[in-house]
Amino acid sequence: MNRLEQLKNSGNKAFVAYVMAGDGGLHRLKEQVQYLQGAGVSAIEIGIPFSDPVADGPTIEAAGNRALKQGVTLQKVLEELQSWTFDIKIPLLVMTYLNPVLKFGIERFTTECRKAGVSGVIIPDLPYEHKQLVQPYMDKENIKLIQLVTLTTTDIRLDEILREAEGFVYAVTIKGITGSRDELSQDVKTFMQKIRKKSPVPVYAGFGISKSSHVDMLRDDVDGFIVGSAIVEAFNAGKIEEIEPLIRAVTTA
């Protein structure tokens, strides 16, 4: 069974933590994953640095640029994951743009992801209409291709995406790029309720989730939360003590 399915069956509110692979050096990724697993996160989304990250806000884009300057590549990240010998009990996700996957080779990418213990892949610039470009290879390796839906997704398109959704639905809470926000729009709550009512898989809210108040606002409307910029900022600033309160806010919801 894919670990994302195990997470769904647990019935707990999920906290998915995002880290940028290679921010501060690729050697830091292992200690970050170990810390987050020990702190109680439900899954970890590992970002692959890319030179044209169209969905990333300033915090994650800056982290990606720092990683690129360290020479971090998709291949190096997958090799790093495959080298780990400690026990990973939670799902690992890879978030990458399409271009690095095409350059690496789609079949090779999914094979190496499986060897690395990856449970799901997020490709934000892969249009839903073209998901068959990678879907057969994902299916072969039992890796879930995670779909994103946004506030601007039409009802017809939303129904199409949800009909074939797997792993979980990545529900974007803002219009625009990733990043921390002070407040979320009230429209978001209605949007999440609509998705959750229709979705056959868990619905996780992401993009802009950075405060306990965001969790409080949506706790009854989603199955989990994805937190990126706030965690990247905390690791970069050496303020990891700021991470655990966010985790507790979700996992005790």
Model-derived segments and their meaning:
Residues A43-D52, A116-I122, L126-H130, A171-G179, ...:
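Glycine-rich phosphate-binding active-site loops on the catalytic face of alpha/beta enzymes
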Residues K69-G71, G117-H130, K144-T153, L158-D159, ...:
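Catalytic beta/alpha-barrel core
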Residues D56-G64, A230-A253:
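C-terminal helical cap(s) of enzyme catalytic domains, especially alpha/beta-barrels
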Residues F15-V19, I44-I46, L92-T96, V121-I123, ...:
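Hydrophobic faces of well-ordered beta-strands that scaffold small-molecule active sites
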Residues M1-V19, L81-Q82, F86:
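N-terminal amphipathic alpha-helix/helix-capping segment at the start of soluble metabolic enzymes
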Residues L26-L36, T153-E164, A205, I209-F225:
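Catalytic cores of alpha/beta
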Residues I44, I48-F50, E61-L126:
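Active-site beta->alpha loop and helix N-cap motifs at the rims of alpha/beta catalytic domains
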Residues I60-A62, Q70, L148, L158-K197:
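Glycine/Thr-rich beta-alpha phosphate-binding loop at enzyme active sites
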